[in-house]
Every structure is written in C-alpha cells, then in structure tokens.
C-alpha cells in the first residue's frame, strides 16, 4: 500500500512539474463596441440632446460652451483580460476650419440620456427630459453634478486635433489605462467627456451620435492567459481513485 501511494505521489509531482513547465499560450482578441449612451451638455443650463443624431464639443458662435458625454459597455471583454490597445473613432459631420484640440476625460460620476431630441442641426439643444444630463444636472431634474459642466478627470486621457468634417481617432496609453481600470473593476465605468477647451467662439465640432449611421466606435485589443491545464488535476484524481480501489481490496 505504501509503495503504491509513493509511486502515485511521484507520478503526480512529475506530472505537476511538467504541467508547470508547459508555456501557457496567451490568447489575443479584439472587440468593436458601439456607444450605449451619449449626450451633450449645453452651457445655457437645462438643455440636452439625449436622443439626437449629434453631440457637440466646443463653443458656438455666441461663445457658449458644449461638452459631450460617451459611454461604452465593456461586458464583452472577459474578466482578467490585459488591455493592449484602445482606439475611439468619431465622425465629425460639421465643423469650420479652426483647429481644436479635443480631449477625452474620464468621467467620475454617472449621468443620463433620455428622450430629448433637438431640432435642426441640434447645436442649440432642447429642454431636457427627465433623466437627461445637462450642464447642471447629471440626471435632470433631481441630481446635480458636483461641478457644473460635468464631473471628470482634469487630465485628458487622450487628445486629438480636429479641424473639418472627417473621421478622427483617439488612441493613447491613457485610454488603455482607463479601460483596464474599468475591466478590472477598480473604478466605475462612467465613460468619457469630450472636451474642447478652445476659448474661440465658433470652435464647436459636431460629432455623429450613436443614433446616427456613422456612430462612435470603440476598438479594444486585449489578451487573456487561459486557465492552467487540468492534466495535473486529473492525474491527482486518477491516483486517488487507484489508491482507494486498492485500499478497498
């Protein structure tokens, strides 16, 4: 009996060591995600555009500022994944030739998108509906931002120079860090604020929203290390069965 147990122990150890010596293959994968929520904050106050075709960042001709909010559901990325790259693609559908540095800032609190839908080109916004985000409210009419204009990290995670109508991509290590922290659960995912800090009137850029054909796209590349092989575990169970059978005899 002791001899059988000793043999089994040696086999288990050898199999376990060999299993540890087998390199684990890192699986690379990617996802392409559409926004699940977006909106525009209009500096005029209780205006919004939750269900509009566009969102805005920058100042209109009268010098009033707009900021956009974006959120993506990262549920398609598995737990434990290592984020390798992040790229946000946005379509500018209307803008003048002024160069504007538009930054993506990680949002620090939750916010809403409701049924408000501005008229015409949507740059003027419309009266907010219940649950909309506004310049003053994260959720209209009952919940205020801590800071008018939205609660977000003062440091941009990524910045892109935007001129006229075109497709633009934001990509940086800062975006990788944001998505990694959201996937890990170390911070809550409230998305990003799109901020154009230009003080020039008429610097606003109009972007296509998720309700538009050319909607925002978030591309994420990640890697996952598979769970260790079960060969060693099976060998342990097999030996246990052999020992128990022989003991029963």
List each model region and its residues.
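Bacterial N-terminal signal peptides that target proteins for export
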Residues: 1-13, 228-229
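Flexible, small-residue-rich N-terminal segments that precede or flank a structured functional core
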Residues: 24-76, 198, 210-215
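A short beta-strand element within beta-rich, extracytoplasmic domains
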Residues: 72, 82-94, 218
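Beta-strand-rich interaction/scaffold domains
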Residues: 95-181
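Proprotein-processing/basic-patch segments
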Residues: 171-172, 176-224
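A short, hydrophobic C-terminal helix/tail in secreted or cell-surface proteins
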Residues: 226-244
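Short, charged juxtamembrane terminal tails flanking transmembrane helices
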Residues: 246-249
